[in-house]
Amino acid sequence: MAKEKPILNVAFIGHVDAGKSTTVGRLLLDGGAIDPQLIVRLRKEAEEKGKAGFEFAYVMDGLKEERERGVTIDVAHKKFPTAKYEVTIVDCPGHRDFIKNMITGASQADAAVLVVNVDDAKSGIQPQTREHVFLSRTLGITQLAVAINKMDTVNFSEADYNEMKKMLGDQLLKMVGFNPDNIDFIPVASLLGDNVFKKSENTPWYNGPTLAQVIDGFQPPEKPTTLPLRLPIQDVYSITGVGTVPVGRVETGIIKPGDKVVFEPAGAVGEIKTVEMHHEQLPSAEPGDNIGFNVRGVGKKDIKRGDVLGHTTNPPTVAADFTAQIVVLQHPSVMTVGYTPVFHAHTAQIACTFMELQKKLNPATGEVLEENPDFLKAGDAAIVKLMPTKPLVMESVKEIPQLGRFAIRDMGMTVAAGMAIQVTAKNK
C-alpha cells in the first residue's frame, strides 16, 4: 500500500457573499472528490428553487435549513487530494453570529484561503472579512492565500484584480501582520472553474498558480513534538486486571512507557506502564494521537476529565490568574468586572471571574481603543485579567498555544473566545 499523503487542514474564510462555498464545491468537484452525477442532480434542484448557480455550494451545505436559506452554518469538513496532500477543508461560516465556529474551525487549520469578491474594490473591504483575517492571525494561522472571486462579473479585468489586490494588501493584510509580497492572489471564477483547479484562458495576463497549486504549496504543519508533554484527559476508566486507564489526545510533546508523569491540577504522580491506540501497544505517542494509557501509582479516583498530564520535570501550569485577549461574540447585555461565566479550555470546564478589564481593542486591527473600559459588549475585543474559581490548567499561547485557547459560555451560548497571553502559576 502506498504511503498515505499527509493531511493539510485549510480554512476557507471571508464574507458570506464572496462565494466561499462555491469555491470549495469547485475544488471538490474538479479534484475528483464528488460524483459528477450529484452535481447534475443538485443543479436541477437549485434551478427548481430559483437559485441557479448555487449547485456547488449545495455540496457543502448539507443541512436542509441551510439549503433553503443559502447560508453556511456549521463548520463542514470535506476532503480532496492535491499532488502533495490530502486536503481537509474547514469551511468557516461568514455571518457575524457564526464567528464562534470560525474560532473553533480556524484553530484546527494549518493554512487559510481568504475568498473575496472582486467587486468589493468599489464598496470597500467588508467588516466581516477584516474580522476573519484578524481572528485567523490571532489563532496562529501564518499561511494565507487570497482567491479574488467572481472575476467573470468584471469580464476578467486585470485592472479590477490589481485594484482589489492593492486594497487588501494596504488596508488589511499589512495591518494584521501578513506580508502581501509573500501571498498569492489568484483571480478565480469559482462558478465557472477559472483558475481553481484548471488554468483559465480568460486571464492571459495572469501567470501565477491556480488555487489548487497554491494550496499544494503550503507547508505541512510541524507536529509540536519538541514542546513539553501536554495531554488533556477526556475520560478515566478502571479496567480489571489492568488498572487505571486514562484516555485523551496528545496535544504537545511525546509520551512513552517508563515516563514519570504528573496530572494537574489533581497533583497525582505516577509512571506510564503502557500506551495504546486502537487496541495496539505503542512504543510512544505524539501530537494528534488519541490514546489510552496505563499509569502505575494513580487510582481512578485521583484524576478526572479536565486534568492535564505532563512530565514531572515540566508539569502543566495551574493558573492562579491569567491575562487574556478575548473577542466578545454575542451577549444580551454587557460584561463587567465580577462576571463569572464558564470557560471551556481543552477538556476542562471551569468558571472564571473577570478581575480587570484592562484594554478595549479594535477587533480588526488590535489597536487599543480605550484603557480600563467599564464594560464590554458584543463585537468588542479586549485584554482582560481572569481568575479561575477552581484549579485550572492554562498555558500562555506563546509557550504552548494548544493549551492557551478557550471559549467562554453562558446562558447556553458561546459569548466569547480568546487566548491566554500571560499566566501566573499557582504556588504549590
From Swiss-Prot:
This chain's source organism reads Methanococcus maripaludis (strain DSM 14266 / JCM 13030 / NBRC 101832 / S2 / LL)
Q: Where is this region: G1?
A: 14-21
Q: Where does it mainly reside? A: cytoplasm
- List the residue ranges of the region (G5): 189-191
Name the domain of life this protein comes from.
Archaea
The residues listed in the UniProt record as binding GTP, with positions renumbered to this chain, are 14-21, 91-95, 149-152
Q: What class of enzyme is it?
A: hydrolase
Note down the stretches annotated as region G2.
Answer: 70-74
Query: What are the start and end residues of every segment in region (G3)?
Result: 91-94
Positions of the tr-type G domain: 5-225
For the region G4, give the residue spans: 149-152
What's the Enzyme Commission number for this chain? 3.6.5.3
Q: Which reaction does it catalyse?
A: GTP + H2O = GDP + phosphate + H(+)
- Residues binding Mg(2+), per UniProt: 21
Reported function: GTP hydrolase that promotes the GTP-dependent binding of aminoacyl-tRNA to the A-site of ribosomes during protein biosynthesis.
What are the cysteine partners in each disulfide bond? none
Under InterPro entries, the record lists:
EFTu-like_2, EFTU-type, G_TR_CS, GTP-eEF1A_C, P-loop_NTPase, Small_GTP-bd, T_Tr_GTP-bd_dom, TRAFAC_GTPase_members
Record's GO cellular component terms: cytoplasm
GO MF entries: GTP binding; GTPase activity; translation elongation factor activity
Name the chain's protein.
Elongation factor 1-alpha
SUPFAM superfamilies linked: EF-Tu/eEF-1alpha/eIF2-gamma C-terminal domain (SSF50465), P-loop containing nucleoside triphosphate hydrolases (SSF52540), Translation proteins (SSF50447)
Alphabetized, the UniProt keywords read: Cytoplasm, Elongation factor, GTP-binding, Hydrolase, Magnesium, Metal-binding, Nucleotide-binding, Protein biosynthesis
